[in-house]
């Protein structure tokens, strides 16, 4: 992120071409969603230390399922953004990150779609699904499963 745009593009192109040439995977950790969109096949969105959505890159940007992902995307400038007024920041504050034992969804206090279920039971991200959101009330697709009923690959 500290690189100028030209150097950043050259480094990312090199990493991408080496990965394809050598048929290897790369793990790219970033806050730069535009960069991830250009160079990643799949994206996992994290919130408060937990994966909340996993999807093919194009699907994530066109049909975000988790409310946090949608808010994150709407708070980031893009090609269609004309002014700062069009950006929608994610409201509220993060939960206490020192407490991983808290029940419920970590985004519940900041979510417009929350219900009592969100506050009391943490949803699971389906590790097998192509596009999955750890959300009881996703914007698209089926709701999450409870943590005890998730199938594993």
Mark where each language-model region is.
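Charged, flexible cofactor/metal-binding loops and thiol motifs
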Residues: 56-153
């Amino acid at each position: 992120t500290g690189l100028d745009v030209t150097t950043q593009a050259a480094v990312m192109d090199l990493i991408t071409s080496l990965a394809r040439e050598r048929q290897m995977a790369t793990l790219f950790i970033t806050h730069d969603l535009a960069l991830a969109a250009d160079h990643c096949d799949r994206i996992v969105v994290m919130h408060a230390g937990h994966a909340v959505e996993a999807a093919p890159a194009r699907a994530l940007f066109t049909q975000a399922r988790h409310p946090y992902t949608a808010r994150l995307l709407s708070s980031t400038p893009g090609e269609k953004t004309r002014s700062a007024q069009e950006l929608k920041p994610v409201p509220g504050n993060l939960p206490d990150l020192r407490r991983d034992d808290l029940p419920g969804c970590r985004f519940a206090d900041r979510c417009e779609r929350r219900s009592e279920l969100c506050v009391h039971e943490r949803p699971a991200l389906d590790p097998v699904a192509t596009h999955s959101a750890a959300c009881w009330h996703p914007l698209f697709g089926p709701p999450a499963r409870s943590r005890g009923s998730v199938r594993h690959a």
